[in-house]
Amino acid sequence: MVPHLVTALTGPINELEQRVLDSMPAIERWFRLEWMEHTPPFYCAVDLRNGGFKLAPVDTNLFPGGWNNLTPEMLPLAVQAAMAAIEKICPEARNLLVIPENHQQSTFYLANIVQLQRIFHMAGLNVRIGSIDPAIKKPITVALPDGDSVTLEPVVRGKRRIGVKDFDPCTILLNTDLNAGVPGILEDLHEQYLLPPLHAAWATRRKSAHFKCYEEVAKRLGKLLGADPWLIHPMFERCGAVDLSTPSGLDHLGTQVEALLAKVRRKYKEYGIKEKPFVVVKADDGSRGMGISTMRDARSVAELGAMLGARQPAPGAQDILVQEGVLTRERINEAVAEPVVYMMDRYVVGGFYRIHAERGDDEDLCAPGSSFVPLAFEQSTHLPQPGVKPGASAPNRFYMYGVVARAAMLAASYELELSDPEAEAFS
């Protein structure tokens, strides 16, 4: 199920949300059956955008940081989920090694590592933090502003295992997305569980592959709800490798942008939506170099090309994804906000709002200047009444977020099955 958390939604429940609330038993049964056939990612975080008429995931992170943004009240949910996940993968586990990002001395990021260490310690494991950063040659302890501290130890490689001094883990938890490539020290670890698996890293993963899988999940969920899948799915176009420093590259991207905008315009017309449609252009491989650009017409492509072309050295050809833009109608203290839902195994364990006071409702909020507002548990005195439809007495406005986020997690499960190098080839 989904915890009852307080959202920024204050208006009346719209048709889509009501359908989701009314379909709660059917939805939960559907997820249970799916998880009998598919293995959920070990953990993930999903960025959602709620435009009022549409709620859709715009990013699914399989190596989530930010665990320190969850409230202390959410800790028991995370611990229970961690226990379930470990029990399923390695029931005899005692020792867990967490591997953080390299070159990360940010106290905010390290507070996230401390929270992960706390969660798995409370789940009954011995937990150490092992760094694969070549610059870390001996244990270092970093004091954090809240009084916590974290000790980073250099990882030691054996023949078929890794660990840290006097600590041999059976399970390795990656909290780094390896977008620069998979280092040799993590390869061929056939005697230890590596979570998430290496093929979940951005070295091989593509956003377009994820959203292709999500498109399939959205169709099935839409059929269950009796609703248009578009209401929970952002359309997209995969551009492939494009060199935006060349006229042909700009033309190709411009064609894809116009094609997707035309599809979105048709949907807006069908639903009587008066907003002006837009798309976002981003790297398909999860790299952050080109950023995320909002475009309302093909003229914006030339501006993006000029901006990237001014960089030295020029970035060259990049895999690019064009995705339907989804407005966000949510606000926290007048600032534009988007919910981020955190999951472990198949469970929703919490979430927070990412907010940005200087960004518009059609812009990417994952940018310098953003901040985070934890979601609190609903302190409702209205208990559900027997005989009343699910969700009718005290509706959980967070439930819809939990459904769409879990649908994205299910899509990630499909995606990892398809990209698993050890899986049997499917005809």
Regions found by a protein language model. Name each.
Residues 81, 104-275:
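Conserved N-proximal alpha/beta basic substrate-recognition cap immediately N-terminal to
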